[in-house]
Each structure stands twice: as structure tokens, then as C-alpha cells.
Regions:
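Acidic interaction surfaces
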Residues: 1-107
Length: 107
């Protein structure tokens, strides 16, 4: 199997896993679906990222061994300290400061 074929295979495996997750979500009541919205979005981002990656053959091999590579990556991602909320707060403050600019210029 060529490296490109390996990457395509892991992508398709992860895509199938995400499709199954989505199908499961759609069986839930709307309020429960909303409780999983963040997880679904991150899982989609994982799928988008894997689409552009060129993993090494051994990386593809070990990911293919997992019954649920998307869930595995998600668990790893959730353990990281990303400063997500700090970024959100910075964006709020930045937007407020930008909206204040015209008021400051008038003074």
C-alpha cells in the first residue's frame, strides 16, 4: 500500500466513525444533541485536519488498529491546555475596544 493509500484509508475509517457518531446523535432528542454540539464540532475539525495531513506509514498503521481513532484523538485533544477561554476573552475585549475607538476619537 502506498503512503497516499494509507492516508486515504485512515481518512475513510475516521469518516465512517464520524458518520456513525452523527447517526447516533440524530437519534437523540434535540436538547441532548445540543449537549454534544461541542464534541461534534471538534470531531469534525479532527476529520478536516486528517484530510490535509500526510501521516507517516507507521502513524497510519497504528491509527488503523484503533476501533475509534476519532474518539482517541478527541480524548487526547481534551487533555491539552489550549487557553481556549482565554482566547475567547481576548476576542471579547478586542471587539469592545474596537467599538470604543470612535467614541475615543470624538473626545
Amino acid at each position: 500500500m502506498t503512503p497516499e493509500e494509507r492516508n486515504t484509508a485512515i481518512y475513510h475509517k475516521m469518516e465512517a466513525e464520524q458518520d456513525s457518531y452523527r447517526d447516533w446523535l440524530l437519534t437523540l432528542p434535540p436538547d441532548e444533541i445540543l449537549q454534544h454540539a461541542y464534541e461534534y464540532a471538534v470531531r469534525q475539525d479532527i476529520l478536516f485536519a486528517i484530510e490535509d495531513l500526510e501521516l507517516q506509514p507507521e502513524q497510519c498503521r497504528v491509527l488503523m488498529k484503533s476501533p475509534c481513532p476519532v474518539a482517541d484523538v478527541l480524548r487526547n485533544f481534551e487533555k491539552l491546555e489550549l487557553g481556549y477561554m482565554e482566547t475567547i476573552r481576548d476576542c471579547i475585549e478586542g471587539r469592545a475596544d474596537k467599538l470604543l475607538q470612535p467614541e475615543k476619537e470624538v473626545r
